[in-house]
Swiss-Prot record:
Organism in which the protein naturally occurs: Streptococcus gordonii (strain Challis / ATCC 35105 / BCRC 15272 / CH1 / DL1 / V288)
Biological role: Catalyzes the addition and repair of the essential 3'-terminal CCA sequence in tRNAs without using a nucleic acid template. Adds these three nucleotides in the order of C, C, and A to the tRNA nucleotide-73, using CTP and ATP as substrates and producing inorganic pyrophosphate. tRNA 3'-terminal CCA addition is required both for tRNA processing and repair. Also involved in tRNA surveillance by mediating tandem CCA addition to generate a CCACCA at the 3' terminus of unstable tRNAs. While stable tRNAs receive only 3'-terminal CCA, unstable tRNAs are marked with CCACCA and rapidly degraded.
Residues annotated as transmembrane: none
Summary of subunit composition and partner proteins: Homodimer.
Entry protein name: CCA-adding enzyme
Entries under Pfam families matching the protein: PolyA_pol, PolyA_pol_RNAbd, tRNA_NucTran2_2
EC code(s) of this entry: 2.7.7.72
HAMAP family, per the entry: CCA_bact_type3
Protein family: Belongs to the tRNA nucleotidyltransferase/poly(A) polymerase family. Bacterial CCA-adding enzyme type 3 subfamily.
Keyword Transport in annotation: no
Length: 399
């Protein structure tokens, strides 16, 4: 098969391929960019595979950076763009289900492609638009099938994260897992416990944010692989409640997706759960805030103080979750409450602790903090204007 017209992303990278070929080596576009071009999806990163060894690649180009030279990857700077050029390679035994004990550089494209995860990612494209398909990846693309390259169990034993990538590709592409591939993913799922939490989080997060997240999540649950993810053993029945969200609902942000997951789990230990997943403190706080907002909304309407205490984007994300649950929502009320706030942070108050110590003799300590918090919420609730004269009169009355 031949592409009559190369996508612009490939056309811009053609000088890289042409220089490598002019030096006497082979070079091809490979991987996800080729797959996405055939599916007419947006192309993000253009990856190039070459028969030139790293030092040979560096001699071809004026500007390069060693970004992963031990694995054969050189970053080539060409026409104000960056391209990763990776030498054809084979990999030895994987020592920890994550990393090969040894990477060997080879001159054979076939040897390079057969170590890849799925057939749809094992396609190569030359400078003339000619596709190289050694593992029937084109057929699988046409039939919307995810099939491991070669023997499925070998691929997942090499790198167990490929199991999560399989579920993520389902969620992203709306493809079906080929039966032998799914069986191997199920059998190899215990190996996920060998993978770093951070790598699993990235794949799970991409799955949840994908347009067909239900498909990927359902396969993750029914395969039993969910049992081997951090702190999710025995969670299948609870997580299946996510399928009760509106059928066309997609998560708008990572924190919203993880909040929905935690709400389904009905856990009271949101922060502990996210520490296990090794997320940032900021991310964990935003997820916890959405969980709190949804809980508040199940009991009462939001107030001005709620709109002050929580970021408006989190309030809106929580309301979206309610809407997906078929509950009554009021987005305009959130915007109106936010617009009615006199201040949006304590930094906007016309007084601070230093002024109160100077003008009223307050000492540093809990009492000063208490009066500042009282002033802050009096302003937020609309009981006190954010005006110096009014605030000082309020303090004098309280004293």
């Amino acid at each position: 098969m031949r592409l009559e017209t190369l996508p612009s992303e490939f056309q811009e990278a053609l000088p890289v391929l042409e220089k490598i070929k002019a030096a006497g080596f082979e070079a091809y576009f490979v991987g996800g960019s080729v797959r996405d071009a055939l599916l007419q999806r947006p192309i993000h990163d253009v990856d190039i595979a070459s028969s030139s060894y790293p030092e040979e690649t560096k001699r071809i180009f004026d500007r390069t950076v060693d970004v992963g030279i031990e694995h054969g990857t050189v970053l080539v700077l060409e026409n104000n763009r960056e391209y990763e050029v990776t030498t054809f390679r084979t990999e030895d035994v994987y020592v920890d289900y994550r990393r090969p004990s040894k990477v060997s550089f080879v001159r054979s494209l076939e040897e390079d492609l057969k170590r890849r995860d799925f057939t749809i990612n094992a396609l190569a494209l030359d400078e003339n638009g000619q596709l190289i398909d050694l593992f029937q990846g084109l057929d699988d693309l046409e039939n919307r099938i995810l099939r491991a390259v070669g023997t499925p169990a070998e691929r997942f034993n090499e790198d167990a994260l490929r199991i999560m990538r399989g579920f993520r590709f389902q969620a992203t592409l709306n493809f079906d897992l080929e039966q032998d591939t799914l069986s191997a993913m199920t059998d190899c799922a215990p190996l996920l416990e060998k993978i770093s939490v951070e790598r699993i989080f990235i794949e799970f997060d991409k799955l949840l944010l994908a347009p067909f997240w239900r498909k990927g999540l359902e396969a993750l649950l029914t395969s039993g692989a969910i049992e081997f993810l951090p702190d999710l053993k025995g969670s299948r029945a609870k997580l299946e409640q996510l399928f009760e969200l509106d059928s066309d609902f997609c998560f708008s942000a990572s924190e919203q997706a993880w909040a929905a997951l935690l709400l389904a789990l009905k856990t009271q230990e949101v922060q502990r759960f996210l520490r296990i997943w090794k997320t940032s403190r900021e991310f964990a706080k935003r997820v916890a805030d959405i969980v709190e907002i949804v809980t508040i909304r199940s009991e009462r309407d939001l107030t001005k103080r709620d709109c002050y205490d929580y970021d408006i984007d989190l309030l809106l994300q929580a309301e979206e979750l309610r809407q997906a649950q078929g509950l009554a929502v009021d987005f305009s009320a959130i915007h109106n409450l936010d617009a009615s706030l006199t201040i949006h942070s304590k930094q906007e108050m016309v007084v601070n602790g230093g002024m109160l110590m100077r003008d009223f003799g307050f000492e540093p300590g809990p009492k000063l903090g208490q009066i500042l918090k009282e002033l802050e919420y009096a302003i937020v609730d609309g009981h006190l204007p954010n005006d110096l004269e009014a605030i000082y009169a309020y303090i004098k009355e309280k004293k």
